[in-house]
Amino acid sequence: MRHTAERRWQKLTLPGLALAALIVPGAASAQQPSRDSRDSMELSIELVDPKVLRVCADPHNLPFSNEKLEGFENKLAELFAKKLGKSLAYTWFPQATGFVRQTLGSHRCDVIMGFPQGDDLVQSTNPYYRTAYAFIFKPGSDLEGIDSLSDERLKAKRIGIVAGTPAATYLAINSLLARAKPYALMVDTRIDSSAEAMVQDLKSGEIDVGILWGPMAGYYAKQETPALRVVPILKESGGPRLTYRLAMGVRAADQGWKRQLNRLIQENQSEINALLIGYGVPLLDEKDQPITADAPTRKP
């Protein structure tokens, strides 16, 4: 999961009240603007580019995004640009301290394609998927059927964990830290990947099981033959949550833009689900049931 450590940017105040003087009495009832024209007016006030979908993204952050446009957020941006009738452009910046401030907050782009819902660094759209931290292990191992960090089998296993993530708290709760191999939370993604390093250690036998953010676990599991097993961790209690809703992030002032994105999410949820499933993302509905390719129309 992505982690940033910056303060929220200041809202941009625009002199929009003067527009009210331009409204001719009775004109609104005589000719209501279409939804598209209302969107266009709102976006012009909000300084959202009306012709270009300007996306803020990390250039080295698979499975989410990269400069080769191979990530699922790249593909989602392509889908939305097509639906909006816009061209697509990127502002690239590493997903680390300063990401929001240097991209969305500086008006260099208009949307972050994936952000935890409720994070106060951005204004969130409605969520378009829900997922969780997950176990990742070799198929056919004696960990088949595991679904909790309290499972007794883990006491004899070497466990890979990204330090500082919510899942690491449960290793402490279950007295498993002595069995853990930590991986760095913040790395230079141009040259390093904690998720990829963990999967390599799993393949070599350095660790027996890894705990990764679900989209990363699913993506790397699909790269192997046979595919690695991915099991969302859904039963933990007494610590931080491990399940999250993911939305898009916009500026707090851009309410019309947020509404437009919300409509796109609602109208294209099945296509969004299918795209994410294709990348191995373990999708969950609100009852923690898996959303699969057999039933991709369900909402998060």
Model-found features: residue ranges?
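Extracytoplasmic small-molecule ligand-binding "clamshell" domains
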Residues: 33-120, 189-192, 278-279
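Bacterial N-terminal signal peptides
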Residues: 13-24
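Acidic, polar ligand-binding/catalytic clefts
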Residues: 78, 82, 87-153, 164, ...
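Alpha-to-beta junction loops
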Residues: 86-87, 105-114, 157, 198, ...
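Extended ligand-binding regions for polar small-molecule ligands
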Residues: 31-38, 71-83, 140-143, 147-166, ...
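Ligand-binding clefts/hinges and TM-proximal coupling segments of bilobed small-molecule sensing domains
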Residues: 31-37, 45, 166-187, 229, ...
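Bilobed "Venus flytrap"/periplasmic-binding protein-like clamshell domains
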Residues: 59-63, 67-83, 135-194, 215-216
